Every structure is written in structure tokens, then in C-alpha cells.
Amino acid sequence: MAFEGVLQIVATLVLMVAIVPFFGTYMARVFQGESTWLDRVLGPIENLVYRLGGVRPELTMDWWSYARAVLASNAAMFVPVFAVLLLQGSLPLNPNGISGMSWDLALHTAISFLTNTNQQHYSGETGASHLAQMVCFQFLMFTSAATGLAVGIAFIRGLLGKPLGNFYVDLTRSVSRILMPISIAFAVVLLSQGVPQSLGGTTEAQLVDPYRTEQDGKREQVTAQKLVSGPFASMESIKELGENGGGSYGINSAHPYENPNPFTNLLEILLLLAVPTSLIYTFGVLANNKKQGWVLFGTIFVLFVGLVGVAALGEYWGNPTVNALLGSANPNFEGQEVRFGWAQSALFATATTGTMTGAVNAMHDSLTPLAGLVTLFNLCLQVIWGGQGTGIAYILVFLIIAVFLTGLMVGRTPEIFGRKLEKREVALASIIFLVHPVIILVPTAIALAIPGLAGNSNPGFHGLTQVVYEYASAAANNGSGFEGLGDATPWWNLSTSVVLLLGRYAPIVALLALAGGLQRKQPVPETPGTLRTDTVLFGSVTAGTILILGALTFFPVFALGPIAEWIANLAGKTL
């Protein structure tokens, strides 16, 4: 069992690495405006979009214009989506008669999908009509992912001293050249594997083996099951590729209609890893230094493999208390699908939280403490591949901090890619770094301090982790959750909405300001004393910076939550 599980993980990682140089090179060609095989088909369509939108693609933007374009376009997308969610009960394409959302739930849901988070305080199959799934969610899954991609590419350009580009062009090309073609192709593959794509309503299937239930002293013979279908294959592909994570069903990719078998599970893992891993290589191509890209990739890959190993060990060892009751050692199968098993569940959990996707093929609330620690660790760092576009930007921010600290140690003015790092750059990098812990820890403290707000279903260490995880997921724009939490309340809807907005747009504005400042700086000629960032040694320094600054910031939370729970489990206690 152990060998088979390890083999599954290794095979998936090998395929992931094999994709990186090809997809990374393709994305570099797209964002440099070079010719691709899609030009003949998509070129005229893109030009039509520019004309209809009044966009002049040859014009470049400064950082403030780019930021305003991001904020204005996202605000314009929010309004109709919010309206549809409120009124979906009165709108067409609602065969199951789903009523409109309450204003606080609609607000949270619209903001959640707008920010590429897809945190769901409702159950997918019973909370949203087909119209909402298509017009609201799938639309925002493309545009929010494209927004992140555009910001990430603009940041790379500024860091390298190039013009930031035009947001509307980057947004359009992200959708037309990257997200849309791949999503269509994989939607067809998922459709062939049994994922539904339909506008029909709920159907009723007769059970082959009826069973009896008893509730409140009443016995009932169950002979049929309701099956919900909808436009789900098209949603599933962009859900993973765009690092969105919002599910058509309440249990997300654990549902057999979203993720029917091990083959689709492999495809979904590769899809959610494809963009953030390949963007690191894209950075190397744009910097004319592929070695730099591979060093950064290797740095994050080593951290990722280590975290996968910890999560897999935790799931393979299982729960000591349960194993003691059974009298044998067994992997953890609580909250998991037997068609995937412990290895693929651990890998999926690590990948989905590392990439800020948020889709799940097992319930994170049921993970062992070690695997739960890994998922929370990923959300708190945001750089173990990271979000769509923003992930590479955060990695480069840690690179900037590492260069600054190294420069201080050797007594030189730090510089990166031929640009000096001065007070403004370090201040902006610090803001980007500090926003995350503040918007996680402050609302967590409020929720835990005021009786009745937290809504956690577990006492003790695990209950603390449930609350912290919800805010960390919102702040990181991930969207997964420890779903034992009672989060369908006005407090959770409104407080996480604020965290979602701050976690998305405050760093984006700061990233663009940092990129704009570096882009304006005069280049500094390279000398024999210039610190090289494309070496394995400096990759190790960057990894150390990530672990020291990122992990230690949240260590008290880790210690009071999953680490304490793990120690208690080893001692045979359940709290």
C-alpha cells in the first residue's frame, strides 16, 4: 500500500515537471506578443474586442493606471453578478427552483468569485441556479484568473525594467490564448469520463439496493436517490486551471460527478498546478535567464515535495486513537474517497492549498493533524507555487527580501536584476508581507473572543484551527475550508468578505507600485561584486527567508492548533 501510494505521488510530480518548460515557454510567447499557432483564429477576435471596448493595445500603462484598470474592471464585474445571485429565484435557467441568496450571502459569494477565491458558504447543487453557475461563476472564474495572470506578468516586467504593459490586453490574451483553449479541451475530456454538462434539472434514480433509515423514531424505506446535474464539465476545467476551486457540488471534487475516477483526479491535479509552476519558468524566459527560472522553481519544488511528504505520512499513519481501537495500523480514511485513497488525497490537499486553488477531493476538516498543518502552512505562506499570477509575484517579493537581507549582511547596497533596492522598495515589500498575517490574526482573535461568533464544531485545538483556517483561506484567496465550521452566518459572510477584498486588492496595488518604482530606476551595470540570484546557494537563502519570515510569523497559531492536536493524538487524547 505504501509503495503504491508513493509511486502515484512520484508519477504525478514527474508529469508536472515535464509540463513546465513547454507551457512556460508558451505563456512567455503569449505575453511578449510573439506569434503562436492560435494567431490566425484569435487575432481577429481580440482586435474586435479591443475595438468594442475602446482599447488601444499599443499603449502601455504606468503602475497607477494599471491598478486603476484592475480595480475598475473588477468593480464593474461585481455589480451584475451580485444582482443575479439576489434575483436568481426569479430568473430563467433555474429548473430546480432555487431561491435567491440573502444579501449577505450574495455579497460574500460575489466577492469570493471576483477575487479568485471561490469560498462557498452555500452548497453548490442547492444554492445556485444553472444561470448563476454559468453567467456568474464561470464568467468570474475566467476573468479573476486572467486578472491575476495580468498582474503577475506586469510585476515581472517592472522588476526587469520593462514597461508594465496594458492591463486590458493582458486580460484579453490571458483568457483567449491560455485559459479558454485549455479549458475547452479538458472539459471535453472530463465529459468523456462522465462529468455532466446539461441544462436539465434534478432526476430521480431507483436504487438497486433500497435501505431503511430511522430518524426521530420513524422508519423509512429509501428506494430512490435524487441526482443533480448541470453545466459542470465546463466549470470543472476552468475551476482547476484558473486556480478557482469553487465546486458545482457541496463536496467539490470529492463528488463522483466532478471527479469520477483516478484518471480525472490526475488531470485535475496537473491542471491546478500547470499555471503557477510554469509561470516561474516564464519568468526565466522573460528575464533571458532560464537558469534563474530553474533555480526559483527548484527552490519551491523542494519545499513542495517536503510538504507533500509530511501530509502523506500523516495520512498513511492514520489516527492513533482509531488504530488502537481497531487493533491494527491503518491509513486515515475518514472524509476521504476510497477511489483516491490516502496518497492522492494528501497530494491533492497539498497542491490545492499550495496553489491557492481551494478545490478538494477529501474533507480537510477530517485530515490528520500533520496533513492539516501542511494545508494551513501553505495558506499562510502563499508561495508554495501560489495563486494565479500573484504566486510568482509573491515568490519574487521574498526574493527581494532575501537580496535585501543578504546585502545588509555583506555591507553592500542591495540590487536585483540591475535595479537598486532602496527605502521605497523595501517598505512596499514589507507591506505586501505584513498584510497577510494582520488580516488573518485580527479577525480570528475577534471571532474567538466574542461568544457565539466562531461557530466551530470542535472544542480545543481543532476548533482553533477551524477558525484560523477560514480566515487564512479567505486572505490567501484559496477558498477551501475546515467544513465543520458553521460559516453560513452574517458574521462569517461579512467578516470574510472584508478579508477577501483586503487579501486580494491591497497586495495587488502594492505589487504594481513596487513594479512601477523598479521600472523607473536607471539600471546599474553588473560588476564582479554583484550578488547573483541564479545560484543554488542563493536559492537556499531564498528558501530560508521564506521559512524564517513566513513560518515563524504564524508559528504560535501552528503550535496552538494542529501541532498541539498532533501531540495530543500521539498521547491517545482526542482534543
UniProtKB/Swiss-Prot annotation:
Q: Would I find Membrane among this entry's keywords?
A: yes
Chief site of localization: membrane
Where found?
Cell inner membrane
Q: How does it sit in the membrane?
A: Multi-pass membrane protein
Gene Ontology cellular-component terms listed: plasma membrane
Q: Which UniProt keywords apply?
A: Cell inner membrane, Cell membrane, Ion transport, Membrane, Potassium, Potassium transport, Transmembrane, Transmembrane helix, Transport
Cysteine pairs forming cystine bridges in this chain are: none
Quaternary structure, from the entry:
The system is composed of three essential subunits: KdpA, KdpB and KdpC.
What protein name does the entry list?
Answer: Potassium-transporting ATPase potassium-binding subunit
Q: Give the species.
A: Gloeobacter violaceus (strain ATCC 29082 / PCC 7421)
The opening ranks of the lineage are: Bacteria, Bacillati, Cyanobacteriota, Cyanophyceae, Gloeobacterales
